[in-house]
Amino acid sequence: MDIKPVILNPRSKNITEGKSRAPNRSMYYAMGYEADDFKKPMIGVANGHSTITPCNSGLQKLADAAIAAIEEAGGNAQVFGTPTISDGMSMGTEGMKYSLVSREVISDCIETCVQGQWMDGVLVIGGCDKNMPGGLMGMLRANVPAIYVYGGTILPGHYKGQDLNIVSVFEAVGENAAGRMSDEDLLEIERRAIPGPGSCGGMYTANTMSSAFEALGISLVYSSTMANPHDEKLNSAQESAKVLIEAIKNDLKPRDIVTRKSIENAIAVVMAIGGSTNAVLHFLAIAHAAGVEWTIDDFERVRQKTPVLCDLKPSGKYLAVDLHRAGGIPQVMKMLLSAGLLHGDCITITGQTVAEVLKDVPDAPRADQNVIRPMNKPMYAQGHLAILKGNLAPEGCVAKITGLKNPVMTGPARVFEDEQSALAAILANKIVAGDVMVLRYLGPKGGPGMPEMLAPTGALVGQGLGESVGLITDGRFSGGTWGMVVGHVAPEAAAGGLIALIEEGDSITIDAHQLLLQLNVSDDIIAKRRSVWTAPQPRYTRGVQAKFAFNASTASKGAVLDNY
């Protein structure tokens, strides 16, 4: 039997081999390449390093480690940059409208560079929230052997014996406005909450998506909960590069890994860890990029059979670094696998199946920790990210429902058409228990860009109204949000969804038990309002925001731009 040699440069040879490619090789020689290098794989390193945000300020050392490992293993590293937006810094401003837009820009960057330069593989490094879905969407579009390296979580800050994180500051603003915290304490929390590089420390969007990537098999085990400053993160970046070289040898591609079954695994883990509502939007987009059939109703199907196992912020007690010490995502996955809630036959980037990767992980969590609960004593029997429907959201919307003392609420609508006026009303004590705040024209097209609502929700929590005031929006929520909040309402206001027709004082019901979001107004009144409603003029007519608003799909389909 003849054994065919492994071709490590199946794509890059299109621009490096043959006499006609002499001009191409001249360009490589200008960068220090030698003749022997043209038989090696050209491996992209999509480096998200940036001094815009602490989430990405610690990525260069990981990129350097990965580059060295690629070259040591016989590859050529080709470095290119990907942009980032700091959700935490842009929160509550017009800048937040660029956050979701950046997901698409990142995916476009990766697809463009990998395809345009005929790369044989790509290693993507990211930190802030949209880096993860944007990176994976680009990897799936290009569909060359690829691995994701998460930049790592931040370590907690400390003040007066309490662990702090970025959400602590948002909530402190509300406490201060309510007279429950001094200016001095607010300033100290501001200064101490974020002690160094890494992504926001709770089970917020970045850590949710990195954990989901580990469950998908597109990142290495244990890598999603490591802290950026720790040496094990460097080691993981180096190991990721070596694993990628093997994936190139075996022609193992992202679409081999990201399947309907592996997405179901990832969502089961998101439910078990109490992850961010943004996972719903992003996995709809990821499935679209992978060519996998996955709908908003699939999240509800997984939720109903998956318990919440981890006591993690924002609604729980612990941070991602605590989860790491308790056994990390592999421990959570092994428990779900043993309970028949994961597909053990899914392939991972290492070439091993999920079951093979987890074979040495204990079936039950250690007794000396409280972060991960045993299967027979979960935090909650069912997942926390519920898909609600009703006349306000016939396409669906997303709510965090676990841990609420009052999972059913009917109250008068308090209507706002921008986040800033809603926040001002909260801080001026104009919102009272029982109100249902409506923030609209903030969807994919209306925002545009579906901005997150952490500033208002953080202020509500800080004022002690987190569970007694409802908030619904066609925008999004930060992974740091908790309380009686419902986001991603679809159809959105700008598309003529019923949320556009709500008037001040209307009765609205949020019912987490019945999975219902309902405007309690007669059909005749709704029809009369619709007859005089007109779509608003676009807020942007040029540039990236105009392109996003014109092309974005509904939130129930992931707010993607290529849904043709």
Curated annotation (Swiss-Prot):
> What subunit structure does UniProt give?
Homodimer.
Q: Where are the transmembrane segments?
A: none
Q: What gene makes this protein? A: ilvD
What is the uppermost EC class here?
lyase
Functionally, this protein is described as follows: Functions in the biosynthesis of branched-chain amino acids. Catalyzes the dehydration of (2R,3R)-2,3-dihydroxy-3-methylpentanoate (2,3-dihydroxy-3-methylvalerate) into 2-oxo-3-methylpentanoate (2-oxo-3-methylvalerate) and of (2R)-2,3-dihydroxy-3-methylbutanoate (2,3-dihydroxyisovalerate) into 2-oxo-3-methylbutanoate (2-oxoisovalerate), the penultimate precursor to L-isoleucine and L-valine, respectively.
User: Binding positions for Mg(2+)?
Assistant: 87, 129-130, 452
Q: Which domain of life is it from?
A: Bacteria
According to the record, cofactor stoichiometry and binding are noted as: Binds 1 [2Fe-2S] cluster per subunit. This cluster acts as a Lewis acid cofactor.
The protein in question is named Dihydroxy-acid dehydratase
Which residues are [2Fe-2S] cluster-binding?
55, 128, 200
Name the pathway it acts in. Answer: Amino-acid biosynthesis; L-isoleucine biosynthesis; L-isoleucine from 2-oxobutanoate: step 3/4; Amino-acid biosynthesis; L-valine biosynthesis; L-valine from pyruvate: step 3/4
Which residues are named in the active-site annotation? Answer: 478
Reactions catalysed according to its record: (2R)-2,3-dihydroxy-3-methylbutanoate = 3-methyl-2-oxobutanoate + H2O; (2R,3R)-2,3-dihydroxy-3-methylpentanoate = (S)-3-methyl-2-oxopentanoate + H2O
Entry-annotated residues carrying N6-carboxylysine:
130
What UniProt keywords are attached to this protein's entry? 2Fe-2S, Amino-acid biosynthesis, Branched-chain amino acid biosynthesis, Iron, Iron-sulfur, Lyase, Magnesium, Metal-binding
Question: Per its Swiss-Prot or TrEMBL entry, what cofactor is needed?
Answer: [2Fe-2S] cluster; Mg(2+)
| Family as reported in the entry's similarity comment | Belongs to the IlvD/Edd family.
Molecular function (GO) terms for this protein are:
2 iron, 2 sulfur cluster binding; dihydroxy-acid dehydratase activity; magnesium ion binding
User: What EC number is given for this enzyme?
Assistant: 4.2.1.9
Q: Which SUPFAM superfamilies match?
A: IlvD/EDD N-terminal domain-like, LeuD/IlvD-like
Q: Which species expresses this protein natively?
A: Albidiferax ferrireducens (strain ATCC BAA-621 / DSM 15236 / T118)
Q: Does the keyword Cell membrane apply?
A: no
Q: Name one GO biological process term.
A: isoleucine biosynthetic process
